[in-house]
A protein has these predicted regions:
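Catalytic, metal-anchored helix/loop core of enzyme active sites in primary metabolism
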Residues: 17, 22-26, 86-88, 94-190, ...
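Substrate-binding/catalytic subdomain of NAD(P)-dependent oxidoreductase enzymes
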Residues: 3-5, 9-111, 116-118
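Catalytic cores of large soluble enzymes that bind and process phosphate-bearing ligands
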Residues: 6-7, 29-37, 59-66, 130-133, ...
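General "foldedness" signal
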Residues: 28, 32, 37, 49, ...
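A conserved regulatory-domain signal marking ACT and ACT-like small-molecule sensing domains
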Residues: 149-263
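Short secondary-structure transition/capping segments
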Residues: 15, 19, 66, 71-81, ...
Length: 263
């Protein structure tokens, strides 16, 4: 995603270059569809909350369908698109999610680029702190393998969780349907009277308030791209709205939708 933002190359070309440099697997499916990030956030959740690895009710979305147009739009709006894995403990219930987000371009996470990874930890009374380092390439991979191998040879059988399973807790998981997010929505539509009215009616019916709306014409004057930034709304209502809008006859391409995070 960083490379797409820097070069304006398409996803396919950037992926092929990443393979050649050793930053992506020869079969990068798990990196692209979010499975690799899903496994990582499950392990980190277990470590952070002293719980068993919880595989249920986790939202997972990959990066394979991100278009250059949305990366460009994000820049114009003051955002960057980042693939985040997030775990939160709310009222003793675990929420885990993996998906692309729009992040303020001036934020710390908004400036984690290239092969750098970052982990943000927030709690009481420690507040918030960040760990940053390279997450791909020969050096980081070799270092991790050698470290784990040496620990095993030294007889450290508690890896990777440090404490026995019997001392871990079971924490109930909930999905993100009841969580609230601001969002970016892009709709490619037939440019005709009544389209904007139909879009806003659908959003209003699902209790979604429009914060900002931009209409960009296509080269062909018959079509236009509608960009909507919403106020915070329930995730289930956002998803329902996208589904309903996708079925409108005036929508010519699959709608694009990104949650907006303030981290």
């Amino acid at each position: 995603l960083s490379r797409m933002s820097e070069t304006e190359l398409n996803f396919k070309d950037v992926l092929e270059n990443a393979k050649k440099l050793g930053y992506a697997e020869s079969n990068p499916r798990s990196d692209l569809n979010g499975d690799d990030a899903k496994s990582k956030i499950q392990i980190l959740s277990s470590l952070a909350f002293n719980s068993f690895i919880n595989k249920s009710k986790i939202t997972v979305e990959g990066i394979q369908n991100i278009d250059q147009v949305d990366i460009t739009n994000a820049k114009i709006l003051g955002y960057r698109i980042k693939h985040l894995a997030i775990a939160e403990l709310k009222k003793n219930k675990l929420i885990q999610r993996v998906h692309p987000c729009m992040i303020n371009q001036d934020s710390y996470i908004g400036n984690i680029n290239g092969v750098l990874n970052a982990v943000i930890i927030e709690g009481k009374p420690i507040g918030k702190f960040t760990i940053q380092g390279e997450g791909a390439g020969p050096g980081p991979t070799t270092s991790a393998l050698v470290s784990d191998t040496c620990s095993i040879l030294r007889g450290n059988i508690k890896l990777p969780f440090s404490i026995p399973n019997k001392n871990r807790k079971k924490i109930r998981s909930i999905d993100v349907s009841e969580e609230f997010f601001s969002s970016y929505i892009r709709l490619d539509v037939v440019d005709k009277t009544g389209v904007l009215s139909s879009i806003t009616k659908t959003l209003s019916k699902n209790k979604i308030s429009v914060k900002r709306l931009i209409q960009n014409p296509f080269k062909s004057k018959k079509f236009a791209s509608i960009i909507i930034i919403s106020h915070r709304a329930k995730n289930s209502n956002l998803v329902k709205s996208i589904s309903e809008l996708a079925n409108k006859k005036f929508v010519i391409n699959k709608p694009k939708f990104f949650r907006i995070e303030s981290i």
